[in-house]
Amino acid sequence: MLPLYFGPPSRRLFGAFHEGSPGRAQSLGVLLCNPFGQEAIRTHRLYRVLAGRLAQAGVHVLRFDYFGTGDSAGEDDAADLESWRDDVLLAQRELQHLSGALEFTWMGARLGGAAVVRAAQQMPAAEPHLVLWDPVVNGPAYAQLLRAKHVEALEISYSLPDPAWRRQLQTEPASFRDEAIGIAVSPAMREQLAALREDQLDVPLASDAFVIADPANRAVQAWVAAQQARGARVESVGLPQALEWTSDDSLNAALVPAQAVQELLLAIDR
């Protein structure tokens, strides 16, 4: 694994490049795109496992942190979805430079899935294969989930939680918006989540997408059906066990479900 920084001086991004095993080198490069906040912390080990397995099979892999997240430059209140889209494109250029690969797969989990689709819309000629793990397709619903999970975390942190927190959550839409379990939510991110809808996430017809999601996630299933209806090459597979992405009970716990790893490896190799 090669740790590195890339990007312009004003926007340095941290990455980890896993070169494909020389004896099994392929022409495929894979970009792994993080989810948001605690979800990114919990999937960090899974991404390392994925990258290692793929590199052993000869695939070149780049993991990276968006600006304002992880080990990249910038504060966490500088992160927003539109800049994530630009960071995906910047990371793609770095992966192409490092690997010399001819074909590319972009994998994004949760909000990272939305960033991947938005990036693909800006680069249709690249025709990347997209792998979307439980993608966020409804911004307002996701923002509400973050607020609710933040209040849960506050309640767990205090031996005598304040009942007013729950009332605020239900009656004051502007409450608990600035932070999600220790991670700042920038004003730009809040605005972009409020505006994010399924019809803004059309998969380019030149690309294709494979979706791994909870079958009970109606928003994702409806989005998949809508994409198929417009002629996009989108397939989906469900996981029998729902994942708890953002939970203070599992704060800082690694999320490495064996079946998800296997499904992701199969989806990337399609």
Regions found by a protein language model. Name each.
Residues 5, 15-16, 55, 62-63, ...:
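Terminal, non-globular segments
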Residues 7-10, 19-65:
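Short, surface-exposed "cap/lid" segments of acyl-processing enzymes
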Residues 107-117, 134:
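Gly/Ala-rich beta-loop-alpha elbow adjacent to hydrolase catalytic centers
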Residues 118-122:
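Active-site signature of alpha/beta-hydrolase-fold catalytic machinery across serine-
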Residues 125-267:
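The alpha/beta-hydrolase serine catalytic core
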